[in-house]
Protein backbone atom coordinates (compact mmCIF):
# COMPACT_ATOMS: atom_id res chain seq x y z
CA UNK A 1 0.00 0.00 0.00
CA UNK A 2 2.65 2.54 1.04
CA UNK A 3 4.90 1.44 -1.83
CA UNK A 4 2.13 1.89 -4.40
CA UNK A 5 1.35 5.37 -3.13
CA UNK A 6 4.94 6.58 -3.07
CA UNK A 7 6.03 4.99 -6.36
CA UNK A 8 3.26 6.69 -8.35
CA UNK A 9 3.39 10.23 -6.99
CA UNK A 10 6.05 11.68 -9.28
CA UNK A 11 4.17 10.72 -12.44
CA UNK A 12 1.21 12.83 -11.30
CA UNK A 13 3.12 15.82 -9.90
CA UNK A 14 2.35 14.79 -6.33
CA UNK A 15 4.36 15.63 -3.22
CA UNK A 16 4.18 13.65 0.02
CA UNK A 17 3.87 16.18 2.81
CA UNK A 18 3.16 13.63 5.50
CA UNK A 19 2.95 9.85 5.65
CA UNK A 20 2.53 7.87 8.84
CA UNK A 21 0.74 4.68 9.91
CA UNK A 22 -0.75 4.21 6.46
CA UNK A 23 -2.21 7.72 6.30
CA UNK A 24 -0.90 10.27 3.82
CA UNK A 25 -1.32 13.96 3.17
CA UNK A 26 -0.31 14.72 -0.42
CA UNK A 27 -0.16 17.99 -2.36
CA UNK A 28 -0.67 18.22 -6.13
CA UNK A 29 -0.17 20.98 -8.67
CA UNK A 30 -3.81 20.80 -9.79
CA UNK A 31 -6.98 18.89 -8.81
CA UNK A 32 -6.84 17.15 -12.20
CA UNK A 33 -3.53 15.53 -11.16
CA UNK A 34 -4.99 14.49 -7.81
CA UNK A 35 -8.06 12.91 -9.41
CA UNK A 36 -6.04 10.92 -11.93
CA UNK A 37 -3.59 9.74 -9.26
CA UNK A 38 -6.31 8.61 -6.85
CA UNK A 39 -8.08 6.52 -9.46
CA UNK A 40 -4.84 5.00 -10.75
CA UNK A 41 -3.85 4.01 -7.22
CA UNK A 42 -7.29 2.53 -6.53
CA UNK A 43 -6.92 0.44 -9.70
CA UNK A 44 -3.34 -0.66 -8.98
CA UNK A 45 -4.32 -1.82 -5.50
CA UNK A 46 -6.63 -4.38 -7.14
CA UNK A 47 -3.57 -6.00 -8.75
CA UNK A 48 -1.28 -6.13 -5.71
CA UNK A 49 -0.42 -9.75 -4.72
CA UNK A 50 -1.94 -9.49 -1.26
CA UNK A 51 -1.31 -12.28 1.24
CA UNK A 52 -4.02 -14.93 1.49
CA UNK A 53 -4.40 -14.19 5.20
CA UNK A 54 -5.39 -10.60 4.39
CA UNK A 55 -7.77 -11.64 1.62
CA UNK A 56 -9.64 -13.84 4.10
CA UNK A 57 -10.66 -10.75 6.09
CA UNK A 58 -14.17 -9.37 5.39
CA UNK A 59 -12.77 -5.86 4.82
CA UNK A 60 -10.24 -7.10 2.24
CA UNK A 61 -11.83 -10.10 0.52
CA UNK A 62 -12.40 -10.39 -3.21
CA UNK A 63 -15.68 -8.97 -4.50
CA UNK A 64 -16.89 -9.11 -8.07
CA UNK A 65 -19.67 -7.64 -10.19
CA UNK A 66 -20.30 -9.88 -13.17
CA UNK A 67 -16.85 -10.92 -14.34
CA UNK A 68 -15.11 -7.84 -12.97
CA UNK A 69 -13.19 -7.63 -9.72
CA UNK A 70 -14.48 -4.60 -7.82
CA UNK A 71 -12.58 -5.03 -4.54
CA UNK A 72 -9.49 -7.00 -3.61
CA UNK A 73 -7.12 -6.39 -0.71
CA UNK A 74 -6.77 -3.18 1.26
CA UNK A 75 -9.53 -0.66 0.60
CA UNK A 76 -8.16 2.84 0.82
CA UNK A 77 -10.26 5.90 1.62
CA UNK A 78 -9.37 9.05 -0.32
CA UNK A 79 -10.48 12.67 -0.10
CA UNK A 80 -9.61 15.51 -2.49
CA UNK A 81 -10.05 19.22 -1.80
CA UNK A 82 -8.39 22.36 -3.15
CA UNK A 83 -7.58 25.77 -1.74
CA UNK A 84 -4.88 27.98 -0.32
CA UNK A 85 -2.99 26.96 2.80
CA UNK A 86 -2.59 29.65 5.45
CA UNK A 87 1.13 29.02 5.77
CA UNK A 88 3.82 26.42 5.23
CA UNK A 89 6.90 25.43 7.20
CA UNK A 90 9.36 22.53 7.09
CA UNK A 91 8.60 19.66 9.45
CA UNK A 92 11.29 19.52 12.14
CA UNK A 93 11.31 15.73 12.05
CA UNK A 94 11.26 15.00 8.30
CA UNK A 95 12.23 18.31 6.67
CA UNK A 96 9.24 18.03 4.35
CA UNK A 97 6.91 20.95 3.71
CA UNK A 98 3.95 21.02 6.07
CA UNK A 99 0.86 23.05 5.21
CA UNK A 100 -1.62 24.60 7.62
CA UNK A 101 -5.04 26.20 7.30
CA UNK A 102 -8.76 25.53 6.88
CA UNK A 103 -8.17 23.57 3.68
CA UNK A 104 -6.29 20.98 5.73
CA UNK A 105 -9.24 20.54 8.06
CA UNK A 106 -11.59 20.20 5.10
CA UNK A 107 -9.37 17.58 3.44
CA UNK A 108 -9.30 15.50 6.63
CA UNK A 109 -13.07 15.72 7.01
CA UNK A 110 -13.79 14.72 3.40
CA UNK A 111 -11.36 11.80 3.48
CA UNK A 112 -12.83 10.69 6.80
CA UNK A 113 -16.30 10.39 5.26
CA UNK A 114 -15.24 7.94 2.56
CA UNK A 115 -15.67 4.20 2.78
CA UNK A 116 -12.80 1.86 1.94
CA UNK A 117 -12.12 1.97 -1.80
CA UNK A 118 -14.07 5.22 -2.22
CA UNK A 119 -12.74 8.58 -3.41
CA UNK A 120 -14.64 11.72 -2.42
CA UNK A 121 -14.11 15.40 -3.18
CA UNK A 122 -15.95 18.67 -2.69
CA UNK A 123 -17.94 19.97 -5.64
CA UNK A 124 -15.80 23.08 -6.18
CA UNK A 125 -12.70 20.92 -6.57
CA UNK A 126 -14.55 18.64 -8.96
CA UNK A 127 -15.46 21.67 -11.08
CA UNK A 128 -11.81 22.70 -11.34
CA UNK A 129 -10.82 19.26 -12.59
CA UNK A 130 -13.78 18.95 -14.96
CA UNK A 131 -13.06 22.33 -16.54
CA UNK A 132 -9.65 21.08 -17.72
CA UNK A 133 -10.86 17.74 -19.02
CA UNK A 134 -11.50 15.31 -16.18
CA UNK A 135 -14.32 13.02 -17.43
CA UNK A 136 -17.58 13.28 -15.54
CA UNK A 137 -19.48 10.23 -16.78
CA UNK A 138 -18.69 7.91 -13.87
CA UNK A 139 -18.61 10.40 -11.00
CA UNK A 140 -21.69 11.03 -8.85
CA UNK A 141 -22.91 14.00 -6.85
CA UNK A 142 -24.13 12.72 -3.48
CA UNK A 143 -25.37 15.95 -1.91
CA UNK A 144 -24.66 18.59 0.72
CA UNK A 145 -23.27 17.60 4.11
CA UNK A 146 -22.55 19.41 7.34
CA UNK A 147 -18.95 18.70 8.39
CA UNK A 148 -17.50 19.26 11.83
CA UNK A 149 -15.33 22.38 11.98
CA UNK A 150 -16.48 23.59 8.53
CA UNK A 151 -18.79 26.61 8.52
CA UNK A 152 -20.84 26.01 5.37
CA UNK A 153 -22.34 22.74 4.08
CA UNK A 154 -20.07 20.96 1.61
CA UNK A 155 -21.28 19.40 -1.63
CA UNK A 156 -19.67 15.99 -2.03
CA UNK A 157 -18.85 14.13 -5.23
CA UNK A 158 -17.90 10.48 -5.49
CA UNK A 159 -15.10 10.32 -8.06
CA UNK A 160 -14.78 7.30 -10.30
CA UNK A 161 -13.96 6.15 -13.83
CA UNK A 162 -14.78 3.26 -16.15
CA UNK A 163 -12.44 0.85 -14.35
CA UNK A 164 -14.08 1.43 -10.94
CA UNK A 165 -17.68 2.32 -11.76
CA UNK A 166 -19.05 -1.05 -10.61
CA UNK A 167 -18.16 -0.27 -7.01
CA UNK A 168 -21.08 0.53 -4.74
CA UNK A 169 -20.96 2.13 -1.32
CA UNK A 170 -23.26 2.77 1.61
CA UNK A 171 -24.32 6.31 2.47
CA UNK A 172 -21.69 8.77 3.63
CA UNK A 173 -20.67 7.95 7.19
CA UNK A 174 -20.38 10.34 10.11
CA UNK A 175 -21.99 13.46 8.62
CA UNK A 176 -25.45 14.98 8.52
CA UNK A 177 -26.96 15.45 5.08
CA UNK A 178 -28.35 18.93 4.44
CA UNK A 179 -31.55 19.27 2.42
CA UNK A 180 -31.34 22.43 0.32
CA UNK A 181 -33.88 22.85 -2.53
CA UNK A 182 -31.66 25.55 -4.08
CA UNK A 183 -28.77 23.11 -4.54
CA UNK A 184 -28.96 22.38 -8.27
CA UNK A 185 -25.42 21.11 -8.78
CA UNK A 186 -25.07 18.46 -11.48
CA UNK A 187 -22.09 16.59 -12.88
CA UNK A 188 -22.55 17.85 -16.40
CA UNK A 189 -20.11 19.56 -18.74
CA UNK A 190 -23.10 21.37 -20.29
CA UNK A 191 -24.00 22.79 -16.87
CA UNK A 192 -20.40 23.87 -16.33
CA UNK A 193 -20.39 25.70 -19.66
CA UNK A 194 -23.69 27.42 -18.80
CA UNK A 195 -22.31 28.43 -15.41
CA UNK A 196 -19.24 29.98 -17.04
CA UNK A 197 -21.49 32.03 -19.34
CA UNK A 198 -23.69 33.19 -16.45
CA UNK A 199 -20.83 33.89 -14.07
CA UNK A 200 -20.31 37.69 -13.62
Q: Model features per residue range: what roles?
A:
Residues 1, 37, 41, 102-106:
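Hydrophobic alpha-helical membrane-association signature
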Residues 1-3, 18:
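Conserved long alpha-helical elements within nucleotide-processing catalytic cores of c-di-GMP signaling
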Residues 8-36, 44-102, 120, 126, ...:
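Catalytic core of nucleotidyl cyclases, primarily class III adenylyl/guanylyl cyclases
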Residues 34, 110, 149:
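Short, conserved phosphate/pyrophosphate- and ester-handling motifs at nucleotide-, phospho-/glycolipid
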Residues 72-74, 104, 113, 150-153:
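A short, structural micro-pattern
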Residues 86, 116-200:
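Intrinsically disordered, glycine/charged-rich C-terminal tails and inter-domain linkers
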Residues 103-123:
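Catalytic/regulatory signature loops of cyclic-dinucleotide turnover enzymes
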Amino acid sequence: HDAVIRSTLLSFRGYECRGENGKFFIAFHHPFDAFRWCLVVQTILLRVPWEDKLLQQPQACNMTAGHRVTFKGLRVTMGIVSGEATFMKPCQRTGRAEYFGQVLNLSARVAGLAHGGQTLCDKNTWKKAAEVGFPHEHSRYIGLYSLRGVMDPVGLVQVSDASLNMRSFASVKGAQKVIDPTDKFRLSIKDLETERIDRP
